[in-house]
Amino acid sequence: MVQIHEIGVPVRSVNWVQFYPGHSKTGDPCIYVIMGQQADNLFVLQIDPETGLFRQFVAETEGSNYPTATFMNRTNRLYIGGAYSGHLFCFDSEMDTLIDLGVINPANATFPCRIDEDNDGVLWIGSYGTADLTSYDPKTSQFTRYGRMDDVDMYNYPLANDDGKIACLIRMTQPHIVVFDPKNGEKKVVGPVTIKGQDTIDLRRCVDGKLYIDSSLGKFRIDGTEAVSVDMIPPPMAINRSLPDGSTFTFTDSDQYIYRKAEIHKPDGKVKSFDLNYESSGSDIFYNHAGPDGCLYGSSILPLHFFRYNPENNELVDLGKCSNAGGEAYSMANLNGKIYISSYPGATISEYDPSKPYHFGTQPGDNPRDVGRIDEISYRPRSTLAGPLGRIWTASIPDYGLWGGPLSCYDPQTGEKKAYYNICGDASCYTLAYLPDQELIAVGTTISGGSGTQPKVAQAILFLWDYKNEKKVWEGTLDRPVSTFNALLTGVDGRIYGTVTGGGKPSELFVFDPVTLKFTDHFPVPTGYPLDLGLQNGHDGKIYGFTSSCIYCLDPATLNIEVIVKGEFGIAGPIIGQNIYFSNGHRLQFAIIF
């Protein structure tokens, strides 16, 4: 069996960075910085603002990678909600350690959204998963779990009002406010119920200590369990980020998603600069791509760093920022010697020429150049295709709380962008393959909508798009339940090969004939779960595919499958030369298959 070889860790960055002024065990002023990472758990830096010296405290609970909710209370205790473990952590300066206080709400609160404090010092935590609400009393070290604040939506962002009631901003499909009374357990919707994509709404604490609803449907003050209409909303209450002497802290490289260079700005105008050489374990890899220059390019996730691996000299380089979308690149495609990078959030497109110097920006001449969102709905551009009409095409999951991910295109010559909304109803376009002989694009869909939604359709489909006449010419699906067409490939024989998942059935490979418009074959994938975008043509005319536990070879002539590499595989990658590349978490790897 073919062996797996290690290349290295392309990116070591951090995410969900927050900072607060505080004091150490000895009472000296310090800065607390909270950072997340994928290859290890979240951590806290305690920084001396005079010297830049720091100590690093890493959470010990497995799966606590992301500090998605943070709060510094009035007694200098720093609280952190960790995703996706759903645990609450506390850095107590008196104990001088990072403590795991326990699970917020077992099996329900995997992603803490916001932490706030009421007048009695009790913490209130809202979470993603079930839009639940939980309190934690530092005096008794007890959690009290109050359950869902909404029966449909999944995100809860609470704020404690001055009367002891808790206002919960519920997102994503119909954002609205729910007021919860801890004394009697009653909850009530107050103010407008908005629709994502049509209206706006936010919940704020203002300088008068009151909570307000600011929405496109009106402005309101929350009094008890009522929303009272107001003409104006006071300024928001500011969070103190200054040290006792008035000094402020900042990262000068935060716009590059690096967070290593820090500055302390003194009230007298003096500036102290520090390099923070903390340990970061590595950022997970989200996508791998074969560039036009024979190198492998890829994207880390949260934050998005663009990286390059050169097989000729084994050079592995973190190139840095390539998009104003800071999440991750979902897909890429090559056209006329350039790489087009499609990134989350917002399905933002960047254009990169590997033959020219690297200088990110948004202006002509920048390289990579961010040219903006491809449309107003697309958010997670799962597939990018180059070629038809000289354009870049994307298939995307829509924005949070929305359904109906479109097929969209961008013309690099003119800068024109176009989206075909509602092309598959409440499903989303997901995968793409080019049929040059038929002058069509094959589009595979998923039943999923944007994050925070439940599917409205039961079956994913494959459809053929006539890009010249801008219309569907055929659509259909397999005779089995399908949730997602998660890989599509035009084989050297002109047929479409793909993988489908979901519907309570084993995942399958299929063959589709674009001439007869029939699914001619379908059969189980080898062991494991088929990876997204996990199919490609090899130099030998065969098709190579990834599952979560193997790499396999499919002979189009016989449809025989041979497993050629066994192991663990997280993200599929390209064939370059004799090697096939892939990644597991933060590690880039390859196997020699030719």
List each model region and its residues.
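Blade-level signature of beta-propeller repeat domains, shared across WD40, Kelch, NHL, RCC1
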Residues: 566-594
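Repeated scaffold domains used in trafficking and secretory/extracellular systems
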Residues: 12-23, 64-70, 109-115, 152-160, ...
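Short, conserved, GDST-rich strand-edge loop motifs in beta-rich repeat architectures
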Residues: 394-404, 443-459
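Conserved beta-propeller blade signature
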Residues: 30-34, 77-80, 123-125, 166-169, ...
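Surface loop/turn motifs at the tips and blade-to-blade linkers of beta-strand repeat domains
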Residues: 6-13, 58-62, 102-107, 146-151, ...
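A short loop-to-beta-strand structural motif that recurs across blades of beta-propeller domains
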Residues: 43-45, 87-89, 132-134, 176-178, ...
